[in-house]
């Protein structure tokens, strides 16, 4: 059997999906979470753990999913305005509401993703990425495939009738494309 420290050192180099698939015991969950994050993030996790008095055995898995499986990315949306969007660690899926909030015309938002499946839940994503993971993830967050968003919003522009709207759409598409291109395993994203 390998020493504990060596196992943790190896686990840090696995993707979040691969780590979830292992269904690690409690001590390993905590160690992998702390090993894969910065000291600042680890301090926040420690504070949350102290505040959580019910001794939830899945606390560290929940934090791992929240921090490592889902990542926050800052993107430009229009005229030097930035928004934070949450995406999976590989950039394949983004939170539907975050994408919609990137557009400055609020009445236009609902039309953008009309033909796109926006009902993918966090539980479905975890099962898709990590089929061996046995814990139920309770979350109301809905996701959408980044490539589907690009395919949908790239076609939605005003053809010069509204310059600021066209710039907003183009900027968001370029930013989402960057997220998609940074994905090493699935680089089949559409161009704008």
From Swiss-Prot:
Name the source's superkingdom: Viruses
Which InterPro entries would you find in this protein's record?
ORF45
Q: Name one Pfam family in it.
A: ORF45
What is the purpose of this protein?
Plays a role in the expression of ORF41, which itself is required for late gene expression.
Record protein name field: Protein ORF45
Organism (species): Autographa californica nuclear polyhedrosis virus (AcMNPV)
